[in-house]
Amino acid sequence: MLQALVERGIAPDLVVGASVGAINGAFFAGRPDRAGVESLAAIWRGLRRGDVFPLGLVGGFLGFIGQRPHLLAPDRLRALLGRHLPVARLEEAKVPCHVIATDVLSGEEVCLSSGAAVESVLASAAIPAIFPPVRIADRQLSDGALASNTPLSAALGLGAERLIVLPTGFSCTLKHPPRSALGMALHAVNLMTTRQLVVDIDRFCSTAEIVVVPPLCPLNVSSSDFSHSGQLIDRAAKSTRRWLDEGGLSTREVPGALRPHAHHKWHPGQHTGPVHDLT
C-alpha cells in the first residue's frame, strides 16, 4: 500500500500507528521517501516467524503455569527494531510520528510522541499474553490495538483533517482456525481491531475526511506466517495502484474487505485440525 502511495507523491503531515502500524509508521516517519519504503519492504521480505516470535517450550510452560504473564521474551523483536528503525527517538523523525499504546491497568489509550523509539514501538506492539508490557514513565504499556488499532481519535486529536488509513485486514479464506496459540491470538486481534475500525469510521466520518485503502481480499495467510510477506507486499502494491487509478482517494466508503465475511464455509462434522497446539 505504502509503496503505491509514495509513488504518487502522497506525503503525510503526520504519522500515527498502533501495533504493527507503529512499526511501519515509525520507520516510514524516519525515512518518508521511496527509498525508505523500499528498505522497509526489504526488511519484511526477509523476516521469518522466529525473528519476531522465538517460540520455546520453556517460555510457553512458564507462561502457562503462571510464572510469568507472557509466553515469549521480547528480545528478538527489540533487537530487530534496534537494527532497523532509522531514528533513536520519536521526535527525531522527519515526519511527526505518534505511536499508540495501551495502559494495561486502566485501558487508557496512550499517545507517545517523544522518547526512545525502540521502547515506544515495542510497547505498541506488545501483544498481551504473548509479549510482556513495557514500562514507560511509570506506566505499563501494551499493544496499542487494545485501545485502537487504527487510532483515528488520536489522529483527530492531533489536528488531522484528512486521514488515509492503511488497514491490515484479516485472513478471510482460512479453512480452519489457526492451529497454534500464537496464530489464534493474532487472528483474534485482527478480527477485533478490524471490526473496531469500521465502528470508528462510522463514528468519525462526519468529523473528518476519512479515506481507507482497501486491504487484500481474499487473504489466506495467517498473521503469524511471514514466509509470504514478499508476495503480499507485491499484491498490495498492485491492488493499491489500481485503486488509485480508479479514483480511490475520492471515495468515502468502508471497503467490503473490512466487513465480516469469509470465503470458506465450514460444514458440521468437518475436520478442522487441532487448535490446541502451543507452538
Regions found by a protein language model. Give the residues of each.
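Patatin-like phospholipase
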Residues: 1-18, 23-279
